[in-house]
């Protein structure tokens, strides 16, 4: 298991009115928040501290509002539904996902999720944030699942069901074949990996039956494919109208709502 300490160990406790509260990043449960959530909060604080405020008084750096379901909820879910042994079974990803969908989420977590969907009607990204994700020595980028949900159904029960299904799918991806194969290559014991889940608002605007941001992109501090006169240490930015992914540009990428 990684010996590195997380960049951010924990977040303020989730408040069931958090979407309009003081804290944009909160935590459900008492376990770890995982590498991705820790990195998001760390880089937000780092960049905010380096802004030249006098020159850019109106610039605000933040991460989209998010609640992180800590790893203790994953442990409870796996234990109470007797799913731990699936990591050793030769099952297809579809069968593993089906087994996880049949499981019941912890009662306290269900209460928090219901409170969330009553308030929030914007599209959401349900993102993995495992203990090993975004580690420097063995980055797990792209190994686990992310689900994007419209979250615009008029019935709160429907929004709740879609959210619960998405969380269970991200949990299930911990046991998918690609994840298990990758874990073996790192020398990590299967039981040492645990999953936190980020529930995060998707930034953008509704345009007709689509929802997307004005622009989006990815910035890297080092460019491995720099052409002169650019230098590798100059970095590189991929920018697009709408949404941009690591593999392709779209004009725009969609979330139908």
Task: Locate each region found by the language model.
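A broadly conserved detector of short glycine/acidic/proline-rich loop/turn motifs that flank catalytic sites
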Residues: 130, 201-203, 242-245
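Non-catalytic terminal extensions of PLP-dependent enzymes
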Residues: 102-103, 205-206, 217, 221
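N-terminal beta-alpha lobe that positions the nucleotide/phosphoryl donor
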Residues: 1-198, 207
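Extended C-terminal regions of large enzymes
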Residues: 212-245
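A conserved ligand/cofactor-binding region detector
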Residues: 199, 204-206, 212-214
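Conserved small/polar residues in nucleotide/adenosyl-binding loops
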Residues: 247-253
